[in-house]
Amino acid sequence: MLRLAIPLFLFALCSFTLFSSARSFITTKPLPIDSFIPKPKLENAAACSYTVIIKTSCSSVSYTRDKISISFGDVYGNEVYVKRLDDPSSRTFEKCSSDTYKISGPCMRDVCYLYLLRQGSDGWKPENVKIYGSSIRSVTFYYNLFLPNSVWYGFNVCNGIGNTKSSQPISTTSSVAAM
């Protein structure tokens, strides 16, 4: 009986570890940051590809012509910055829709901060932002509020490690639910 129990316990432990590290869900509230300045692009950094999916809330304005910028990174100072994600002629960020972007940037460890910047008069309410990459765990940041104008707004869950500071915890959830 003991021979069977030990391998079964090890299998369960390995399975839990595998699934618990598969996805991160950020459960804190987004905050404004006054002193955030995106970093310039690093010249000789290895390039990795990231998929960013931004879901606009169903309680947002029908669409926005506002300029939307994004910046995300890891605890080691690697950062991806896109000055303008939106394309006013294609009606991006429509109410109840998702917009997907393929973005290249420096290779990083797991993403622990993400900020959005909205500039304009239309307004916009993102529901969530999901980031995928071959070298990182997928992560979802939940906004679900109207972004203020001309203020970087988002999350820093780096827990004070490395070059970034945070007072917000990260919550990793064991889940195999579709994202």
Swiss-Prot record:
Residues 1-22 form the signal peptide. One of its GO terms (cellular component) is plasmodesma. The keyword Membrane does not apply. It is found in: Secreted. Its main location: secreted. InterPro entries: Embryo-specific_ATS3 (IPR010417), PLAT/LH2_dom_sf (IPR036392). Residues 48-158 form the PLAT domain. Expressed in roots, rosette leaves, stems, cauline leaves and flowers. May play a role during embryo development. Interacts with EULS3 (via N-terminus). This is Embryo-specific protein ATS3A. It comes from Arabidopsis thaliana (Mouse-ear cress). The gene is ATS3A.
